[in-house]
């Protein structure tokens, strides 16, 4: 049992510290070489004493008694400050004589200056030196160092070790992540290489087809050149024949339709794969010339109209004139069955919420289809709109061509002065009259008749040679006829830049042609009429694109530029500004009505001012060089849009709502940004604030 009595501890302490006892101890006769030879670590021998509960309470009670000091309440003695003696003056203070101090006491205490172990460099630089020697460094730098410096060096060395370990771990982790990223990129690269290999194979097939087309074109050119030489010799020998009769052998070049054949072959293969993958598709869709697949989307589900719950997954196939909806079979996974099919002319599409489309088919059947992704929803909706617009343009163009051809042929027949202008036989004339009588109901017959008429006129002119040589006017007219035939391809594909370029080239050729023969004059008039019809068709398509395109700014800008190239800059500017006005109105409607009028006003201000600024920048690009001529139209439009904005603000402030300084600040900032494009409408805001000053906080 350990006794914690403080009395005994004090007695023991006095015994150990007594100088008399120390002198009586014998001094060691032999010095040890190692002072710590018999040293035993306290951690190995020291043990905590075991104290019982009773002794622990006893010690605690005794400690409390010693530490508890009870002093009486201290009361300071009274001091009379009035009777205190005065303080001595500075003259009476004794002067200290420093000369009595010893010189040794006056010397400052010089300490040992700290030693720079690292020599101005970091410890990492010293250890990373390839010529570093540890023993030499310790001997030179730490030989005379103090314990504090050695401890500081050891601490730095330990920190450096931990830092290096952390860097090693970080580098290992970084290397691992980079390796994983490289593996992912390698997987992507391998997939892309496989796709590239398949594309290269397809390209080789296409290049082989192009080679065959080129060889066939060369053969046709050689044959045409040989036939033209033969026709020249024939016209020299048979100049006494009638010029209106067709030649025995036509000298017109056969047109190479290889590219069209290849394209139709690709479309046929796509339809064949559709028939193989969708059961029952052949019942609804029949192979037809020009019929092709525009889009195949499998991100759709059919929705129950009553419960709005998904029924089954569907796949939608959009053709250029039809739409097919196929569903997955429940018994066989992966196989498709045709469910609905309808012509695009009989299909009605309505947009619903949550990426849902409502289809009204021609058989009065109504279905709801929901897309899993917004991109699939937007892609199908845009393709349906473009396909329906293209069909509408085709039908409208056929009807317009039929009407214009009927009127033009009626005018040409009424202005003929002699029966020699009829280049066809009576039987052909009778059939032509019957065709003209039904042009309005059958526009395809009108186009066929026009082509036959142009071919007959061009073929008959090969035999007309007054000087015995080839008629250059006939050659140019035939060239223009072929160019007009090829012009329909870029117009149908909406490639307006190429179409306008070819149209200008054809018009320049027609301006330089001077026809003297009657057949040449008639063909020239027909070509000019067809050229004007093509120009009108391109104008209608561009007008439709500019009026309906809101999302794609590049497409809108290119369409406006194409309409300017057609020689209608004023109309193009009006359509462009009208499109932007509708775009602003749609964005304002999307913002909706808010309970907070200030938030609504600030959002509308940002939308309108930023759109006006962008329109001004696009105007400078579109009308580069002629901005001064049409700038007044732009300024008038901008002024109207700003007036619309303030009118909208006035409507919002009809109630008890008030404008906050933050809303005014944002509106002023947006209007100030218009100064960068030359528009200053700050005075309108100031006038508005003066009129409605009672509506401001």
Swiss-Prot record:
Its main location: cytoplasm. Keywords: Coiled coil, Cytoplasmic vesicle, Exocytosis, Isopeptide bond, Protein transport, Transport, Ubl conjugation. InterPro entries: Cullin_repeat-like_dom_sf, Exo84, Exo84_C, Exo84_C_1, Exo84_C_2, PH-like_dom_sf. There is a cross-link at residue 169 (Glycyl lysine isopeptide (Lys-Gly) (interchain with G-Cter in ubiquitin)). GO terms for cellular component: cellular bud neck; cellular bud tip; exocyst; incipient cellular bud site; transport vesicle. It is found in: Cytoplasmic vesicle, Secretory vesicle. Pfam families: Exo84_C, PH_EXO84, VPS51_Exo84_N. Involved in the secretory pathway as part of the exocyst complex which tethers secretory vesicles to the sites of exocytosis. Plays a role in both the assembly of the exocyst and the polarization of this complex to specific sites of the plasma membrane for exocytosis. Also involved in assembly of the spliceosome. Component of the exocyst complex. This is Exocyst complex component EXO84. It comes from Eremothecium gossypii (strain ATCC 10895 / CBS 109.51 / FGSC 9923 / NRRL Y-1056).
């Amino acid at each position: 049992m350990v006794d914690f009595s403080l009395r005994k501890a004090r007695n023991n302490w006095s015994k150990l510290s007594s100088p008399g006892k120390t002198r009586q101890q014998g001094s060691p006769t032999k010095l040890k070489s190692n002072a710590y030879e018999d040293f035993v670590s306290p951690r190995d021998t020291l043990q905590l004493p075991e104290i019982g509960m009773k002794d622990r309470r006893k010690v605690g009670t005794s400690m409390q008694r010693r530490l508890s000091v009870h002093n009486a309440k201290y009361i300071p003695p009274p001091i009379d400050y009035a009777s205190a003696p005065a303080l001595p003056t500075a003259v009476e203070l004794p002067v200290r004589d420093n000369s009595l101090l010893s010189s040794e006491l006056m010397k400052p205490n010089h300490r040992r200056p700290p030693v720079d172990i690292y020599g101005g460099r970091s410890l990492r630089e010293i250890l990373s030196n390839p010529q570093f020697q540890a023993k030499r460094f310790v001997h030179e730098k730490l030989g005379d160092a103090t314990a504090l410096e050695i401890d500081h060096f050891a601490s730095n060395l330990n920190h450096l070790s931990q830092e290096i370990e952390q860097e090693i771990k970080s580098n290992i982790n970084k290397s691992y992540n980079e390796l994983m990223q490289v593996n992912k990129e390698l997987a992507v690269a391998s997939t892309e290489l496989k796709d590239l290999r398949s594309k290269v194979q397809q390209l080789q097939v296409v290049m082989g087809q192009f080679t065959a087309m080129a060889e066939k074109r060369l053969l046709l050119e050689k044959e045409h050149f040989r036939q033209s030489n033969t026709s020249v010799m024939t016209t020299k020998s048979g100049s006494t024949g009638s010029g209106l009769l067709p030649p025995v052998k036509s000298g017109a070049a056969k047109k190479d339709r290889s590219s069209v054949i290849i394209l139709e072959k690709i479309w046929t293969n796509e339809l064949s794969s559709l028939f193989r993958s969708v059961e029952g598709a052949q019942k609804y869709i029949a192979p037809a010339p020009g019929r092709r697949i525009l889009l195949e989307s499998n991100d759709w589900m059919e929705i129950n109209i009553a419960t709005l719950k998904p029924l089954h997954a569907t796949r939608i196939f959009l053709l250029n004139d039809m739409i097919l909806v196929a569903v997955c079979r429940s018994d066989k996974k992966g196989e498709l069955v045709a469910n609905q099919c309808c012509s695009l002319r009989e299909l009605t599409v309505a947009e619903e919420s949550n990426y849902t489309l409502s289809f009204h088919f021609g058989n009065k059947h109504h279905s709801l289809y929901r897309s899993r992704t917004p991109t699939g929803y937007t892609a199908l909706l845009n393709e349906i709109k473009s396909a329906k617009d293209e069909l509408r343009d085709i039908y409208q163009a056929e009807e317009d061509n039929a009407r214009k051809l009927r009127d033009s042929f009626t005018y040409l027949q009424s202005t003929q002065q002699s029966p020699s202008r009829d280049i066809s036989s009576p039987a052909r004339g009778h059939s032509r009259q019957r065709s003209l009588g039904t042009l309005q109901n059958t526009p395809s017959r009108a186009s066929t008749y026009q082509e036959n008429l142009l071919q007959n006129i061009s073929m008959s002119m090969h035999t007309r040679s007054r000087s015995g040589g080839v008629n250059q006017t006939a050659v140019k007219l035939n060239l223009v006829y072929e160019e007009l035939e090829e012009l329909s391809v870029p117009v149908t594909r909406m490639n307006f830049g190429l179409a306008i370029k070819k149209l200008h080239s054809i018009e320049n050729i027609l301006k330089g042609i001077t026809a003297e023969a009657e057949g040449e004059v008639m063909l020239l008039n027909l070509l000019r009429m067809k050229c004007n019809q093509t120009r009108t068709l391109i104008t209608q398509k561009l007008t439709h694109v500019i009026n309906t395109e809101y999302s794609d700014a590049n497409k809108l800008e290119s369409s406006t530029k194409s309409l300017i190239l057609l020689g209608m800059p004023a109309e193009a500017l009006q359509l462009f500004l009208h499109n932007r006005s509708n775009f602003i109105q749609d964005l304002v409607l999307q913002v909706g009505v808010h309970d907070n009028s200030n938030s609504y006003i600030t959002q509308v201000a940002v939308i309108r001012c930023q759109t006006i600024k962008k329109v001004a920048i696009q105007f400078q690009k579109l009308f580069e060089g002629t901005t001064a001529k049409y700038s007044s139209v732009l300024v008038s439009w901008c002024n109207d849009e700003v007036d619309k904005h303030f009118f909208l603000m006035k409507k919002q402030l009809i109630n008890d709502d008030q404008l906050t300084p933050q809303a005014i600040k944002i509106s002023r900032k947006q209007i100030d940004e218009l100064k960068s494009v030359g528009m200053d409408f700050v005075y309108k805001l100031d006038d508005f604030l003066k009129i409605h000053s009672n509506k401001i906080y």
